[in-house]
């Protein structure tokens, strides 16, 4: 069972996620160095080249952020010991247990 949990933590640590959020602003100015698309008030504005975009008045901006988890491995103070066909988890310190719990909580 513990081997599965550790493998699950490793799998979760490599997972990427996209999050969409929005901001309500009164005015918006941005410089776009290349072609891109910006969503403003649920409408897509297409930028075809380098330009400064200015929007006056209240508007809602959508942002899609890709959160990429840093590759991780099993912490050095956590080992899996195989004995008599049973898996045992040996935590050398409480810090190891805290780190594993923090990794689990961070990705829920």
From Swiss-Prot:
The keyword Lipoprotein applies. Residues 1-17 form the signal peptide. One of its GO terms (cellular component) is side of membrane. The GPI-anchor is attached to the protein in the endoplasmic reticulum and serves to target the protein to the cell surface. There, the glucosamine-inositol phospholipid moiety is cleaved off and the GPI-modified mannoprotein is covalently attached via its lipidless GPI glycan remnant to the 1,6-beta-glucan of the outer cell wall layer. Induction: Expression is induced in high iron conditions. It is found in: Secreted, Cell wall; Membrane. A lipid is attached at residue 84 (GPI-anchor amidated asparagine). It is a lipid-anchor; GPI-anchor. Glycans are attached at residues 18, 41, 77. Residues 85-108 form a propeptide. Keywords: Cell wall, Glycoprotein, GPI-anchor, Lipoprotein, Membrane, Secreted, Signal. Belongs to the SED1 family. Cell wall protein that plays a role in adaptation and resistance to cell wall stress. This is Cell wall protein PGA48.
